[in-house]
């Protein structure tokens, strides 16, 4: 029973780590409760850095790689 629980927990963790994270660059700031003109100035710049995360694998026999032949597209 313990082995099957460990296998189920491992599968749940593996699926959870495989889920993509969606985020967008944005800037939202506010200087709340500023006592004067020169205090509480807020400057924010949204930054978007495209990241290539597909096809970054190294192995000896490339044909046996599960990523072989997959298509990849960058944002």
From Swiss-Prot:
Keywords, alphabetical: Amyloid, Cell adhesion, Cell wall, Disulfide bond, Fimbrium, Secreted, Signal
Signal found in the keyword field: yes
Biotechnological and industrial applications of this entry: The small chaplin mixture (a cell wall extract of an rdlA-rdlB knockout) forms a stable coat on a number of surfaces (including Teflon and cotton) and emulsifies oil-water mixtures, which could be useful in medical and technical applications.
Superkingdom assignment: Bacteria
Signal peptide per UniProt: 1-23
Entry-linked PROSITE patterns: CHAPLIN
InterPro entries given in the database record: ChpA-H
Coiled-coil annotated residue ranges, if any: none
Location of this chain's protein in the cell: Cell surface; Secreted, Cell wall; Fimbrium
Keyword Cytoplasm included in the entry's annotation: no
GO cellular component: a single term: cell surface
GO biological-process terms attached to the record: cell adhesion
Null allele phenotype: A double chpA-chpD knockout has no phenotype; a quadruple chpA-chpC-chpD-chpH knockout has delayed aerial hyphae formation and sporulation. A quintuple chpA-chpB-chpC-chpD-chpH knockout has a longer delay in aerial hyphae formation and an almost complete lack of sporulation. The quintuple knockout still expresses ChpE, ChpEF and ChpG. Quintuple knockout chpA-chpB-chpC-chpD-chpH has strongly delayed aerial hyphae formation, makes many fewer aerial hyphae but no effect on viability of the spores produced.
Domain Chaplin, residue spans: 34-74
Pfam families cross-referenced by the UniProt entry: ChpA-C (PF03777)
Coarse class of the protein's main subcellular location: other
Conditions for induction: Not expressed while still submerged, accumulates during aerial hyphae formation on minimal medium, no transcript detected during sporulation. During aerial hyphae formation and early sporulation on rich medium, under control of ECF sigma factor BldN. Expression depends on bldB but not bldA, bldD or bldH (at protein level).
S-S bridge residues: 54-72
Its job: One of 8 partially redundant surface-active proteins required for efficient formation of aerial mycelium; the short chaplins assemble into a hydrophobic, amyloidal fibrillar surface layer that envelopes and protects aerial hyphae and spores, presumably anchored to the long chaplins. Chaplins have an overlapping function with the surface-active SapB peptide; chaplins are essential on minimal medium while on rich medium both chaplins and SapB are required for efficient aerial hyphae formation. Chaplins are also involved in cell attachment to a hydrophobic surface.
Family membership: Belongs to the chaplin family. Short chaplin subfamily.
Record-given protein name: Chaplin-D
